[in-house]
Regions:
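Non-heme Fe(II)-dependent double-stranded beta-helix
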Residues: 2-11, 17-117
Length: 117
């Protein structure tokens, strides 16, 4: 996989198409949609939620848009956070060895728009 390291250095990001196989990402997507609907028993400090006075999921619970440290809670998230291809890509753009410091996921459900925040 080829990364545009120059773009990363100049703009602070680069696109890494095909970094993680789609099948692995679909497992994460399905789990995130389940989290969106309240399918968890995680501590609340793992989530950033939309204003509960305005937004509720289909079960009446809060609508999470951010998940902090999901790899601490479930293997499916650890598999991505510790994915060897992700580590290799980060080492390439950062020009040296890397260490996992944190992990997070963002959730974009159909009811979430730029007007939601």
């Amino acid at each position: 996989m080829q990364l545009d390291v120059q773009q990363y250095r100049e703009q602070g990001y680069t696109v890494a198409r095909g970094l993680i196989p789609t099948a692995e990402l679909l497992r994460i997507r399905m789990r995130l949609m389940d989290l969106l609907e309240g399918g968890h028993s995680w501590p609340p400090d793992h989530f950033q939620v939309l204003d509960p006075a305005r937004f509720r999921n289909s079960k009446g619970g809060p609508v999470p848009v951010g998940v902090q440290r999901p790899a601490r809670c479930e293997q499916v998230f650890r598999d991505i956070a510790e994915h060897p291809r992700l580590e290799q890509a980060m080492a390439q753009v950062l020009d040296g060895p890397v260490e996992l410091f944190t992990d997070q996921a963002l959730i974009k459900g159909p009811q979430i728009s730029g007007q939601s925040f």
